[in-house]
Amino acid sequence: WKRLTQGYLKQFGIHVTDEEDVACEGFSQPQVAQYFADRYPELPGGAPGLMEGMDRLITTRYETIAKPKDGVIAFLDGLRRRGIKMAIATLTARRHAEKALRDRDMMGYFDFMLTIEDVGISKYQPDIYLKTAEKMGLAPADCMVFEDAPYACTTAKRAGFRVCGMVEPAYAAGESELRAASDLVVEQSFDELQGKL
C-alpha cells in the first residue's frame, strides 16, 4: 500500500521521502491523506481529494491485482477442519477488505472482522489484536497473529500473542524486525507451515 500512495503522489510531482514513509507507517488511509495534505498544500482537493484518488487506486488494486498468498486456501481449510477460530484484524477500510474477501470466496473462513474503523488506532498499539482476542473469548497467548508489517509483529508479540510473520518485499527494510518478533515465518507460501501448527 505504501507503493500505491507513492505512485499516486508522484503524478503531482511529489516523491515520498524515507522520512515521510516511516512517519506514515501504521497510519490509516485518512491519516495518510491528512499527513500529505498538510505537508503539500498544493495537492488538489487537500486531504479529501487525496483520499478519493487513493481510494480509486486501492479499489482497482483489490479488484485486479491483489491475490491470496500461495497456499492460504488449503491452510484455512485445514484450520477450519480442526475447528480453529479465525478472525481478521486489519487497518484496511472495511469496504475494501470485505470486497476483497468476497471476490475471492474467503469471507466464510472468518468468524468476524475488526478494522481501523472499529478501533480508531494503528497497530503500533495492540488494541485491534486485544479486541479481536477478547471477541473470540481467547487470551492473547492462545492466539496467533499473522502479520506482514514488521512493526505490527513487534506490537502483537509485546502484547503476548504468538506471531507468524509473513515476508513481503514492501517491508524488506524491516525484515530483521519481523523475524525477531515472529515465532514462525512464512517466506513465500503457507505450505511452509505444514506440521508447524
Where do the language-model regions lie?
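Asp-based, Mg2+/Mn2+-dependent phosphohydrolase catalytic module
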Residues: 77-80, 93-197
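N-terminal helical cap/lid subdomain that shapes the substrate entry/recognition surface
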Residues: 1-73, 77-82, 95
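Residue-level detector of anion-binding/catalytic polar loops
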Residues: 15, 85, 162
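Generic anion/oxyanion-binding catalytic loop in active/binding sites
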Residues: 10, 21-22, 61-64, 86, ...
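N-terminal start-of-chain detector that recognizes signal peptides
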Residues: 5-6, 57-60, 85-87, 116-118, ...
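Hydrophobic beta-strand core positions in alpha/beta domains
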Residues: 87-88, 165
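Residues at secondary-structure transition points
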Residues: 23-27, 45, 49, 63-70, ...
